[in-house]
Curated annotation (Swiss-Prot):
Belongs to the bacteriocin class IIA/YGNGV family. This is Bacteriocin sakacin-A. GO terms for cellular component: extracellular region. Keywords: Antibiotic, Antimicrobial, Bacteriocin, Disulfide bond, Secreted. The gene is sapA. Residues 1-18 form a propeptide. One of its GO terms (biological process) is defense response to bacterium. It is found in: Secreted. NCBIfam families: bacteriocin_sig. It holds the Pfam family Bacteriocin_II. Disulfide bonds join 28-33. Bactericidal activity; inhibits closely related Lactobacilli, Listeria monocytogenes and ivanovvi, Enterococcus faecalis, Carnobacterium sp and Brocothrix thermosphacta.
Length: 59
């Protein structure tokens, strides 16, 4: 890590981080929540397939 740049206060304020992921495409930080639609869609489809497969296994 020899190539390091010290960030100014203005540059630091533009960084958004510390968001919490709920594992289904929903993220929240201390100001707002948002949805990653691709991740949410994948989570929903995965849940549907899992439910369908477990239903077949119970037959």
């Amino acid at each position: 890590m020899n190539n390091v740049k010290e960030l100014s206060m203005t540059e630091l304020q533009t960084i958004t981080g510390g968001a919490r992921s709920y594992g289904n495409g929903v993220y929240c930080n201390n100001k707002k929540c948002w949805v990653n639609r691709g991740e949410a869609t994948q989570s929903i489809i995965g849940g549907m397939i899992s439910g369908w497969a477990s239903g077949l296994a119970g037959m």
